[in-house]
Amino acid sequence: MISVGIVGGTGYTGVELLRILLRHPKAQVRVLTSRTEAGKPVADMFPNLRGHTDLQFSDLNIDALKECDVVFFATPHGVAMQHAKDLIAAGTKVIDLAADFRLQNLEQFEKWYGMEHACPDVLKDSVYGLTELNREKIKQAQVIGNPGCYPTTVQLGLAPLLKSAQALIETKNIIIDAKSGVSGAGRKASLGMIYSENADNFKAYGVAGHRHHPEIVEALENIAGKKDVFEGLLFVPHLVPMIRGMLSTIYVDLTEAGKQTALQALYENFYANEKFVDVMPANSSPETRSVRGANELRIALYKPQPNKLIILAAQDNLVKGASGQAVQNMNLMFGFNEDEGLQGIGLLP
């Protein structure tokens, strides 16, 4: 049994971590911090956990966190990098659900997040936690940068094409049209997130530039093993009036080799042994409600024209897009079965 700390337990990803870990047979949450709710029982804030835990929120105490085997940071950007060096020096592993360890390019990090990186030496040795594509490195990692929710759908949606020995798509013409429920914006109150602003409404945001764009580009370059080939990639996220769920529609142009490839078989073979990636039959339509509450991503392919491919990828942004994937990474880091604590089936209806 490993001991777990969660820094930032009052946000949506923090409480989702707690919900998942309370069912984990080999992990026990011992520390749960909050800057604003110290001393308050968790079940008083989240009644779904009543009867399942007697934990109370506490102030962040680095010495208490050092006693844990692993600490998750479900905090704003910039928090984990302030504490990661001390924790790993004490032998504690770190999994950050913010952006502190996602981008290796410091210039891009500082540009998009408006801060200098506090521990570039730790960043250099950290591992990007897209589980299905980085499994062996994750097993050896001390610090994990958990991927963003949108980048998770994009990477898993495109990986079979980019990992192929042949160039199957035109990498400069990729268009990503992505939609997310409002929980992706976090729990902090803001005018744009209140019910009357979002109900019966549907809008794009970050059209001029979104923080996940450089993460997507860097990650795709690593998958493809090529630099500067995704300059023309377009990414536009949208906010839809639902609580959880994410659907990314990815449009690509096929090369001559891509036109001749059995793409459905390519995807089915690539993900044949993956427990959390479901390749649906061709021309299917993955629905967000089918993965609600589950650590699963569903993919479907359409080929509307000989030189065009549409990839649909659906996930729960709080689970496979955040906390579930973080626990998946934790399982690998400690040698557990990868699906330990993550066998939940999506909630439907």
Swiss-Prot record:
PROSITE patterns according to UniProt: ARGC (PS01224)
SMART domains per the UniProt record, alphabetical: Semialdhyde_dh
Subcellular localization, as worded in the UniProt entry: Cytoplasm
Chief subcellular location: cytoplasm
EC number assigned by the record: 1.2.1.38
GO biological process entries: L-arginine biosynthetic process
Reaction catalysis annotation: N-acetyl-L-glutamate 5-semialdehyde + phosphate + NADP(+) = N-acetyl-L-glutamyl 5-phosphate + NADPH + H(+)
Xref: PANTHER family: N-ACETYL-GAMMA-GLUTAMYL-PHOSPHATE REDUCTASE, CHLOROPLASTIC-RELATED, N-ACETYL-GAMMA-GLUTAMYL-PHOSPHATE REDUCTASE, CHLOROPLASTIC-RELATED-RELATED
Entry protein name: N-acetyl-gamma-glutamyl-phosphate reductase
Keywords: Amino-acid biosynthesis, Arginine biosynthesis, Cytoplasm, NADP, Oxidoreductase
Function: Catalyzes the NADPH-dependent reduction of N-acetyl-5-glutamyl phosphate to yield N-acetyl-L-glutamate 5-semialdehyde.
GO molecular function, one term: N-acetyl-gamma-glutamyl-phosphate reductase activity
Active site (UniProt): 149
InterPro entries documented for this protein: AGPR_AS (IPR023013), AGPR_type-1 (IPR000706), NAD(P)-bd_dom_sf (IPR036291), NAGSA_dehydrogenase (IPR050085), Semialdehyde_DH_NAD-bd (IPR000534)
The organism's place on the tree of life at top rank: Bacteria
